[in-house]
């Protein structure tokens, strides 16, 4: 049986860990609230942009753009969004597992895909499996700005426009609730299925519609990537908050068990001492 000193040291150590996980839970809750606000503030911009683009693409003018046209797929680009830090439950593992499975199931050679990875966890995951990472981005803020992701947006949209990749997919955790996130692997380019707006507003365009499409479609693709990153950040903070809450609860349970063990050990030690005293007194009679 462990000594009283050893048990007390374990209790003290677990209490220190509990303080850390509780603080991390509170920090993640604050970051989650801000991330949800950022996500909500970005949505009206994307809704209006989608409304205009769907009006043009679904109109009768026949306006087209290369970003709308499907072509034979020889190489697929994947934007994989993970975090720079762990301690977030299954947040990273779930999206990396699904992407890894798709790479193995749909491709026979590394020449058939390019990985654009956001987050240290994702970069380390693929490199440890000898899977080439074409471009990596790490060190993003917990509340990312569009300027921060502009480079990877430029790389991916540019690669599609130049014909270096024939389709582009977004892979990330989408926020469902604080305790639930859903992995999404969705096609970003070509933009073949822009959702039709529910608005019945009719627009008159100046200059011609194809010129407007040429200006707006890259912005729309960039917005989809940035929106996915905002959504993923909400999921990350929610997952970390839930994980730290669970860790704090587990620490409480462990402390209760250790205290019970400590009390039993102390009681056994006292009983042993009394027995020895009584035995010694009896021997003197």
Curated annotation (Swiss-Prot):
GO MF annotations in UniProt? ATP binding; proton-transporting ATP synthase activity, rotational mechanism
A biological process (GO) of this protein is: proton motive force-driven plasma membrane ATP synthesis
Q: How does it sit in the membrane?
A: Peripheral membrane protein
Write down a Pfam family by its short name: ATP-synt
Q: Which family does it belong to?
A: Belongs to the ATPase gamma chain family.
The family database entries (SUPFAM superfamilies) matched by this protein are listed as: ATP synthase (F1-ATPase), gamma subunit (SSF52943)
Q: Which InterPro entries match?
A: ATP_synth_F1_ATPase_gsu, ATP_synth_F1_gsu, ATP_synth_F1_gsu_CS
Keyword check for Transport: yes
Lineage here is: Bacteria, Bacillati, Bacillota, Bacilli, Bacillales
Q: What Gene Ontology cellular-component terms does the record carry?
A: plasma membrane; proton-transporting ATP synthase complex
Descriptive protein name:
ATP synthase gamma chain
Q: State the species of origin.
A: Exiguobacterium sp. (strain ATCC BAA-1283 / AT1b)
């Amino acid at each position: 049986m462990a000594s009283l000193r050893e048990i007390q040291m374990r209790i003290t150590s677990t209490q220190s860990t509990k303080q850390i996980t509780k603080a991390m839970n509170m920090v993640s809750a604050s970051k989650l609230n801000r991330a949800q606000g950022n996500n909500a503030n970005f949505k009206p911009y994307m809704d209006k942009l989608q409304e205009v683009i769907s009006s043009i693409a679904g109109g009768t003018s026949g306006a087209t753009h290369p970003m709308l046209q499907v072509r034979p797929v020889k190489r697929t680009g994947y934007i994989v969004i993970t975090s720079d830090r762990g301690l977030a439950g299954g947040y990273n593992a779930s999206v990396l597992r699904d992407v890894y499975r798709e790479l193995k199931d749909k491709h026979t050679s590394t020449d058939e895909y390019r990985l654009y990875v956001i987050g240290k966890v994702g970069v380390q995951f693929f490199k440890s499996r000898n899977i080439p990472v074409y471009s990596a981005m790490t060190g993003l803020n917990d509340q990312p700005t569009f300027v921060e992701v502009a480079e990877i947006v430029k790389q991916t949209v540019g690669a599609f426009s130049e014909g270096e990749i024939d389709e582009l997919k977004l892979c990330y955790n989408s926020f469902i609730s604080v305790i639930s996130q859903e992995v999404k692997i969705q096609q970003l380019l070509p933009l073949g299925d822009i959702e039709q707006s529910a608005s019945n507003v009719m627009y008159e365009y100046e200059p011609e519609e194809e010129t407007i499409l040429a200006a707006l479609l890259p912005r729309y693709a960039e917005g989809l990537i940035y929106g996915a990153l905002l959504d993923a950040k909400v999921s990350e903070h929610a997952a970390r908050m839930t994980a730290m809450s669970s860790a704090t609860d587990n620490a409480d349970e462990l402390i209760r068990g250790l205290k019970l063990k400590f009390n039993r050990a102390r009681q056994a030690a006292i009983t042993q001492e009394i027995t020895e005293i009584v035995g010694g007194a009896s021997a003197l009679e």
